[in-house]
Amino acid sequence: MDWMPLVLAAEEAESRGFSLNLNLLETNIINIAIVFGLLIFLARGYFGRVLGERKSEIENGIREVENRGRQAEQELATARQNLSQAQVQAQQILASARTNAERVRAQVLDQAQIDIARVRETVDQDLRNEQQRILTQVRLKVVGDALARLRERLPGELDEATQRRLLDRSIQLLD
């Protein structure tokens, strides 16, 4: 590299009041300090603003996540409470259904007993009626047969005096 043009430019600038120090040990430390100082001074506001915005975004994100977490916890608590109430209600419905089923079963059994008793009574009444009808038929048959035999025997055995006595006795029995 050719240092000569730089040296000439530095000498000319020095003659006018501004000069470059070409001593590498002195210039690097001073230049670095100046650049760092300017960088810190100028960039502090920009980086402070950028970092502040980023910090604000992160804080807002954290608050939003915390709010959603609290809301989720509240919804979970509500859901658990609803589940508990639903379980209690289901147990009540089940108990009520069992009670109703037992009551209906008892009513059906009672009604069946009543119906069985009614059928037995009807059967007994029908049997008594049938027995009565058969007895009546037997009596009528016996009386009919007796009358038929009597009619066969009476004309020869019954004279007028016997007929009067029978009539008188029958009249007395009616009084």
UniProtKB/Swiss-Prot annotation:
Gene Ontology cellular component list: plasma membrane; proton-transporting ATP synthase complex
CDD domains recorded: ATP-synt_Fo_b (cd06503)
Source domain of life: Bacteria
Entry's localization field: Cell inner membrane
GO molecular function: proton-transporting ATP synthase activity, rotational mechanism
InterPro entries in UniProt: ATP_synth_B-like_membr_sf, ATP_synth_b/b'su_bac/chlpt
Membrane topology classification: Single-pass membrane protein
One Pfam short name: ATP-synt_B
Keyword Transport: yes
Record's keyword terms, sorted: ATP synthesis, Cell inner membrane, Cell membrane, CF(0), Hydrogen ion transport, Ion transport, Membrane, Transmembrane, Transmembrane helix, Transport
Transmembrane segments: 22-42
Secretion signal span: none
Assembly behavior: F-type ATPases have 2 components, F(1) - the catalytic core - and F(0) - the membrane proton channel. F(1) has five subunits: alpha(3), beta(3), gamma(1), delta(1), epsilon(1). F(0) has four main subunits: a(1), b(1), b'(1) and c(10-14). The alpha and beta chains form an alternating ring which encloses part of the gamma chain. F(1) is attached to F(0) by a central stalk formed by the gamma and epsilon chains, while a peripheral stalk is formed by the delta, b and b' chains.
Alphabetized NCBIfam families for the sequence: PRK07352.1 (NF005606)
Function: F(1)F(0) ATP synthase produces ATP from ADP in the presence of a proton or sodium gradient. F-type ATPases consist of two structural domains, F(1) containing the extramembraneous catalytic core and F(0) containing the membrane proton channel, linked together by a central stalk and a peripheral stalk. During catalysis, ATP synthesis in the catalytic domain of F(1) is coupled via a rotary mechanism of the central stalk subunits to proton translocation. Component of the F(0) channel, it forms part of the peripheral stalk, linking F(1) to F(0).
Family: Belongs to the ATPase B chain family.
Record protein name field: ATP synthase subunit b
Lineage of producing organism: Bacteria, Bacillati, Cyanobacteriota, Cyanophyceae, Gloeobacterales
